From Swiss-Prot:
Gene: rnc
Signal peptide: none
Species per Swiss-Prot/TrEMBL record: Vibrio cholerae serotype O1 (strain ATCC 39315 / El Tor Inaba N16961)
Function: Digests double-stranded RNA. Involved in the processing of primary rRNA transcript to yield the immediate precursors to the large and small rRNAs (23S and 16S). Processes some mRNAs, and tRNAs when they are encoded in the rRNA operon. Processes pre-crRNA and tracrRNA of type II CRISPR loci if present in the organism.
Subunit structure: Homodimer.
Listed name of the protein: Ribonuclease 3
Source organism superkingdom: Bacteria
Keywords: Cytoplasm, Endonuclease, Hydrolase, Magnesium, Metal-binding, mRNA processing, Nuclease, RNA-binding, rRNA processing, rRNA-binding, tRNA processing
């Protein structure tokens, strides 16, 4: 059963005047009728502009090459899919029977496309400045962490590439504990990696940070062990 839509809009930080726009943004092309690809096209362009503009302002002395690499890191599919999981977007997607059966609600590409479509929907429901402020709020932590010239691959990406290069299955991340009040929570995540006897534990102030911490530890153990 789909959770109440107000839970999603609360996580997004935006309440739609036209709820049909949000419904359309959540509708994959595998479902019959109208779908989210036009909104995705629009949202992709808005996201790219907003992130480019923010990087230009934040890093006045950084060259075009570094800014392009930072933008690519922030707007790539797996970053958008991470955002989608933070919003529990998979619980709200409207998919056709085939995609539902094959677990499309967990697929990175479908989650990433839906995030872009939601950005397009927010823009159409409001204006560019509102869409910009929402996107920058979503990206606040990532923008604070990103640095020019540094490796733009986060620990989860590096762990995934390490395992893929050795033809091993991808790691599985599970939230095992959340403690504290909503504004001051600590997440504990277990990361299961093929070939490691016990799951690796990571902690952080968000699910994403806990997963990254677990991936970093797993990488250290795999490369040093």
């Amino acid at each position: 059963m789909t959770p109440p839509m107000n839970k999603l809009t609360s996580k997004l930080g935006y309440t739609f005047k036209e709820t049909e726009l949000l419904n359309l943004a959540l509708t994959h092309r595998s479902a019959n009728g109208k779908h989210n690809e036009r909104l995705e096209f629009l949202g992709d362009s808005i996201l790219s502009f907003v992130i480019a503009d923010e990087l230009y302002r934040r890093f006045p002395k950084v060259n075009e090459g570094d800014m392009s690499r930072m933008r690519a890191t922030l707007v790539r599919g797996n970053t958008l899919a991470e955002l989608g999981r933070e919003f529990d977007l998979g619980d709200y997607l409207k998919l056709g029977p085939g995609e539902l059966k094959s677990g499309g609600f967990r697929r990175d590409s479908i989650l990433a496309d839906a995030v872009e479509a939601i950005i397009g929907a927010i823009y159409l429901d409001s204006d560019l400045e509102t869409a910009r402020s929402i996107v920058l709020e979503w990206y606040h932590g990532r923008l604070e962490e990103i640095k020019p010239g540094a490796s733009q691959k986060d620990p989860k990406t590096r762990l995934q590439e390490f395992l893929q290069g050795r033809r091993k299955p991808l790691p599985v991340y599970t939230v095992t504990n959340i403690k504290g009040e909503a504004h001051n929570q600590e997440f504990t995540v277990a990361c299961e990696v093929a070939g490691m006897d016990t799951p690796v534990i990571g902690k952080g102030t968000s699910r994403r940070k806990a997963e990254q911490a677990a991936a970093e530890t797993a990488l250290e153990q795999l490369t040093n062990g």
